[in-house]
């Protein structure tokens, strides 16, 4: 009997102590703004994908929507609350046929079933929207969808002005992300605001070139690109990080690794935290079997995202082994 009393007293004491602890339930009665959540391990970070922006209903197609998509993809890649993730990795999964991607970029497709795609592709957050020309200015409408349905879609309207190197547009985007619950880490803000010296014409050319790249790369076209077709955006905006970065990937796709490296180096001089170009430099080093250079760029990328240098080195070893099997 005394043993039973002792056990009962112990259970009561434990229950009393637990009652004093602060409640940690994630599903409490209060709703949380999009993005606000209990801290999770790095491996459980969610993905955010940036879709090509579409022309506002009734407006003619140009490449600006794809150009802004490329800009935002490079910004979001710096946000360490998300896994690094690029639209180019899933083009064919989202648009199974070339004509579907082409129609989407022109605003002539049915709206994507983002909830279904999110579940299929394990992509929780989707950023999409439209471009609207208004006399002498360009309005960008952005929508952020949480496919787990824990909050409503969030929408914002921003003005795109190349005169300030697209910094005002990006500051507005970061402010909106903060309102959605995805505050950009202080250490990453300056990296997201590199001077993108471009023009609307260059963004148009860049977007048209990017569409060609996606179509060629995603559907296994074996013929090489004509790199001269991708010179126009760089010629129009010679100090544009985005233009040099895309040209690097075109040359990389052609397996012209030396020329690709030059383009990526030009991009990194403009934007030292450009993850796309730094990834390109790493891959050029992998395929030229320059192990030390591959380590250098992989670790630079890890530093920018606050990730493990050792894991970056291990990843390079694995990639080199796979590339030369």
Segment roles from a protein language model:
Residues 25-81, 198-215, 238, 249, ...:
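A structural "domain/chain start" motif
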Residues 35, 92, 96-207:
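Catalytic-center loop of serine/cysteine hydrolases
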Residues 40-114, 126-135, 153, 194:
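Short beta-strand->alpha-helix linker/helix-N-cap micro-motif
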